[in-house]
Structures are given as structure tokens and as C-alpha cells.
């Protein structure tokens, strides 16, 4: 039984009860650059990896402002993400105009999930190939949701999507219990450290990541590269200092071993040479 018999139409079920077109859209999310979100009781931080197509091109935006109290980070097809972020912005504006109050984050996420779900039921449409991390703050507190191309949505304390996101998830799973009481600065630091986990040995620089934050009495805004680099320097320089101290200790030990050898004459010198030849 071949898969390609059942994946030509989004409304065709396979005998095992799967919609392959929807699964393909979910795979597209895994191909995009990593996006990370985490929240405390008062703040939400969104971060993403800036991935350029080539050295000659600029990177595409992966984090969008929806309203002063809502932002979204995407992974997958950027064009689909732009369309959905525009839809979210329109919904927020319409709600504010009609009710003269900010749109609750949960309600916006439900509207977004309904829009994505319709695309899994119409033969003339295709699922959106993008995953969205929606972070926001309303009367009930800070929220972080993940919207899936299938139309499902889930609320998280912290989450990561996109390429090599499993490494970031592992880091977040070790730390998430402390996020609720984290300060603004600690939350930003944890977000950047999670981004570093997805780079697989590549040196983390402010040009490689984008960070946005919103919170109580703090509208949604992006951190500038200088602020991001200052945070990076706080944990990138520590290993270098420890390495320098280690090298100094090794140098002192070698000097201490060399002193008796010089006093002992040629025999000690031969003993020093032998291990190097082995």
C-alpha cells in the first residue's frame, strides 16, 4: 500500500487514519529555523535564529508584532507566517475597535486555530506550512501558545519549534520549573541560551538571533543587538576565563616539575623526554 495513493488531496484519508498533506505541512515547520518562547508570570520572551539563504542576502523576519500585548514567532514557510500574522493583527484591531478593550490572547489563538483547521477540510486549499508561537499578556496573566498546521493549539510554559529545536527543548525542560518566578533579565538570558543550543557548535552572536519581549507595563518590542550582545557576553566570557586560569595552573605545575629536573642533572632530563616519545 503506497503512501502516494493517499497524499494527493488534503481530504483523502489513508487506511491507517492519517492525512498525509497535513503531516507534510507539520514537517515543513521542522525545516524552518528555530523559534523559541518562554514565559514567567509577568513577561513573555520570543527568540528566533536569523538564518540567511546565502552570505549575500539578509535574513527574513521570524517575529512579528500583533499588538502591544501580543507577538508571534514563526517557523516554516515565512510567506504563510506573514499572511497569518496579518490576519491576527486584523482580528486584534477589529476587537479593539468594537469592544474598546484588548483582545484576549486565548480567543485570538482559537480564531487562528479555526482558520488553520478549515484548510484541512477543503479540497481546494492546502494546510498552512508554518507553526506559530503566540505570546501575549491579558487580564488572566502571561500566555504562550503553539498553533499547529493541523488546527490544534497548546499552551506551554516554554516551547521551541523549527530545525534542531529538540536541543532547545531539552534545555527548557531542565529549567522550566524556575521560569514562573524568573525576572525579566533571567528570562531573556534563558531564551538566548536556548537559541545557542540549536546552533550546534556555531559561535553565538547578536547578529544570529532576534529577541522580543512583552510584559506588565512593557509593550511588545524588540531588543537591539547591543542589548543582546551584552547578555551573550555574560555567559560566553566565563569559559574563556576558566580556561585561562587552567592554563596558568598547568604552567605553574610544569615549572615546579622542571625545577627539580634541572637540579637533578641529565638523568631527570632523560626521564622527561621518554614520555614524549611514547
Curated annotation (Swiss-Prot):
It holds the Pfam family Proteasome_A_N. Induction: Slightly induced by heat-shock and high intensity light. Residues 238-278 are annotated as: Disordered. The keyword DNA damage does not apply. Keywords: Acetylation, Cytoplasm, Isopeptide bond, Nucleus, Proteasome, Ubl conjugation. Residues 239-255 have a biased composition (Acidic residues). The modification N-acetylmethionine is found at residue 1. CDD domains: proteasome_alpha_type_1 (cd03749). GO terms for cellular component: cytosol; nucleus; plastid; proteasome complex; proteasome core complex, alpha-subunit complex. Its main location: cytoplasm. Belongs to the peptidase T1A family. The proteasome is a multicatalytic proteinase complex which is characterized by its ability to cleave peptides with Arg, Phe, Tyr, Leu, and Glu adjacent to the leaving group at neutral or slightly basic pH. The proteasome has an ATP-dependent proteolytic activity. Negatively regulates thiol biosynthesis and arsenic tolerance. This is Proteasome subunit alpha type-1-A. It comes from Arabidopsis thaliana (Mouse-ear cress).
Amino acid at each position: 500500500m503506497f503512501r502516494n495513493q493517499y497524499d494527493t488531496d488534503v481530504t483523502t484519508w489513508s487506511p491507517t487514519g492519517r492525512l498525509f498533506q497535513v503531516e507534510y505541512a507539520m514537517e515543513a515547520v521542522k525545516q524552518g529555523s528555530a523559534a523559541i518562547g518562554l514565559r514567567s508570570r509577568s513577561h513573555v520572551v520570543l527568540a528566533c535564529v536569523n538564518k540567511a539563504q546565502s552570505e549575500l542576502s539578509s535574513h527574513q523576519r521570524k517575529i512579528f508584532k500583533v499588538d502591544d500585548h501580543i507577538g508571534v514567532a514563526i517557523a516554516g514557510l515565512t510567506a504563510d507566517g506573514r499572511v497569518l500574522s496579518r490576519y491576527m493583527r486584523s482580528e486584534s484591531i477589529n476587537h479593539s475597535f468594537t469592544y474598546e478593550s484588548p483582545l484576549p490572547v486565548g480567543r485570538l489563538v482559537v480564531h487562528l486555530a479555526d482558520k488553520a483547521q478549515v484548510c484541512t477540510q477543503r479540497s481546494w486549499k492546502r494546510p498552512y506550512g508554518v507553526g506559530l508561537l503566540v505570546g501575549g499578556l491579558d487580564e488572566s496573566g502571561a500566555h504562550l501558545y503553539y498553533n499547529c498546521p493541523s488546527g490544534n493549539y497548546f499552551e506551554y510554559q516554554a516551547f521551541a519549534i523549527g530545525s534542531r529545536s529538540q536541543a532547545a527543548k531539552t534545555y527548557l525542560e531542565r529549567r522550566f520549573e524556575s521560569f514562573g518566578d524568573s525576572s525579566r533579565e533571567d528570562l531573556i538570558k534563558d531564551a538566548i541560551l536556548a537559541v545557542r543550543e540549536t546552533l550546534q557548535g556555531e559561535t553565538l552572536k547578536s547578529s544570529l538571533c532576534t529577541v522580543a519581549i512583552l510584559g506588565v507595563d512593557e509593550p511588545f518590542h524588540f531588543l537591539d543587538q547591543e542589548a543582546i550582545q551584552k547578555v551573550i557576553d555574560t555567559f560566553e566570557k566565563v569559559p574563556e576565563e576558566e580556561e585561562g586560569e587552567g592554563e596558568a595552573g598547568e604552567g605553574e605545575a610544569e615549572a615546579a616539575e622542571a625545577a627539580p629536573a634541572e637540579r637533578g642533572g641529565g638523568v631527570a632530563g632523560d626521564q622527561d623526554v621518554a614520555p614524549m616519545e611514547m
